[in-house]
UniProtKB/Swiss-Prot annotation:
Keywords: Isomerase. It comes from Fungal sp. (strain NRRL 50135). Its EC number is 5.5.1.-. Diels-Alderase; part of the gene cluster that mediates the biosynthesis of pyrrolocin, a bright yellow trans-fused decalin-containing tetramic acid with antimicrobial activity. The PKS module of prlS together with the enoylreductase prlC catalyze the formation of the polyketide unit which is then conjugated to L-serine by the condensation domain of the prlS NRPS module. Diels-Alderase gNR600 is involved in endo-selective Diels-Alder cycloaddition to form the decalin ring. Subsequent methylation is carried leads to pyrrolocin A. It is an enzyme of class 5 (isomerase). This is Diels-Alderase gNR600. Belongs to the Diels-Alderase family. Pathway: Mycotoxin biosynthesis. GO terms for molecular function: isomerase activity. Pfam families: DA_C (PF22903), DA_N (PF24137).
Length: 408
């Protein structure tokens, strides 16, 4: 019998605590969209729902990451990171905070049926006077075919993002085993909708100062009929990111007939500085490589793995500019000045696909350490791509982001 399941977190209550909290188990063959920490979340844990779309050549792009974690406690809300870029290079980026995070599921169990998420402000201010309604909401259909994100944040952003799964076999997008959903032990990271077509119709407000008078409103549009694509991420863990990694690269891109989605991290000293990844490659909307094992370039070249059983793998290497090169390049704003990445997918049958990503346009940037020669941060780019299998050279574009954390 169908029912409605509800998970409510209120930043002003006792929803964020210190110490262990109950965590619902991973469900094989499911998108696991309903929260895993349903009534409370501890101060190291996090849950993520992410949506993004970009135009055919990456001229315009938008992304939103909705979090449940402790990072916004001192700001009075669970945070949402929203970023947009226009063809002329204009950018908009804000971290928004919402006192309440509510997720509901309509189905026979929390992991079946339609999902609705609400990040919203409280209906009253501390003094009891009505407050302006602010919210970001999302709905995901039962078959994972459509996700709609609605923005209603007056004087900042309004409008919608719509993602439509374009994969011919949606079941193949879902991890059949817990291992297939793991980025790192106890860290889950999934692309449950697979390749998607994207539409976005949004209006952003610009002001000279935070909370100041609106000086300009600007519309942003991404259309699937014009080649708009994107991705959707679901992740969660009881482990804070700095506990297991110090470097990460995320990308979603459309390159010719290929669609690729990936998060690769480099482990911290506590994790042995090993690489870890969740990577998916689609050809003509069919999944051809599902890698949960990251290897270095030498292992990729040799086709060797740490196990005897053939497995899909991915290798990721940074590209640095030649010291005396006159080439115009784009890099991050921090100490890591890489200009792109080489991504190689290797199937268990040793089929290979290589993609060269170069940072095409800088998008967003934020420090994660104090300024200085070794400063770290996170940077986002519109990425240009070349690649495919042996003998193929497709062009494409996507969105990518790098994160470095100042831990050993």
């Amino acid at each position: 019998m169908a029912g409605t399941f509800v998970s409510v977190l209120d930043i002003s209550g006792d929803s964020v605590v210190t110490g262990p909290v109950p965590v619902e188990p991973f469900v094989p063959g499911s998108a696991n969209l309903f929260p895993k920490m349903t009534s409370r979340i501890n101060d190291t844990a996090w849950e993520l729902w992410e949506f993004e779309g970009f135009s055919a050549g990456g001229e315009a792009a938008v992304g939103v990451s909705l979090y449940r974690d402790a990072r916004g406690v001192d700001k009075g809300g669970f945070h949402a990171e929203v970023n947009a870029i226009w063809p002329d290079g204009r950018k908009w980026g804000q971290t928004l905070y919402f006192a309440e995070s509510i997720v509901t599921a309509e189905g026979a169990s929390p992991d079946e049926g339609r999902i609705h998420g609400f990040w919203r402000s409280n209906s009253n201010t501390a003094g009891g006077a009505p407050a302006a309604a602010r919210s970001i909401t999302f709905s995901i259909s039962e078959d994972l075919g459509v996700a709609t994100v609605c923005f209603s944040v007056p004087d900042q952003v309004t409008g919608t993002i719509e993602l439509r799964s374009s994969g011919s076999n949606r079941k193949s997008c879902l991890p059949a085993t817990e291992e297939a959903a793991l980025l790192y032990p106890s860290v889950y990271y999934m692309f449950p909708m697979g390749p998607v077509d994207a539409n976005a119709d949004l209006t952003f407000s610009f002001s000279a100062t935070a909370g100041g008078e609106i000086e300009e409103e600007r519309k942003l549009s991404v259309q699937s009929r014009g080649g708009g694509h994107g991705g959707m991420v679901r992740g969660w863990s009881t482990e804070a990111w700095p506990q297991f990694m110090n470097d990460a690269y995320y990308v979603v891109a459309k390159v010719g007939s290929y669609m690729l989605q990936m998060l690769r991290v480099v482990g911290s000293a506590a994790a042995g500085h090993r690489p870890y990844a969740v990577a998916r490659l689609y050809l003509n909307k069919e999944l051809v490589c599902a890698a949960n094992q990251a290897v270095d370039a030498q292992s990729a070249a040799e086709g060797s793995t740490a196990t005897t059983q053939p497995r899909d793998m991915v290798a990721v290497e940074k590209v640095l500019s030649e010291p005396k090169s006159q080439e115009q390049v784009v890099s991050g704003a921090f100490s890591d000045k890489n200009i792109g990445y080489v991504i190689e997918f290797i199937s268990g049958q040793q089929k290979r696909w290589r993609f060269d990503a170069r940072h095409k346009r800088a998008w967003w940037s934020e420090p994660t350490s104090a300024p200085g020669p070794g400063c770290t941060g996170k940077s986002g780019w519109i990425e240009g791509f070349l690649g495919g299998s042996d003998g193929e050279t497709f062009e494409g574009a996507g969105v990518g982001g790098q994160l470095q954390i100042p831990v050993p």
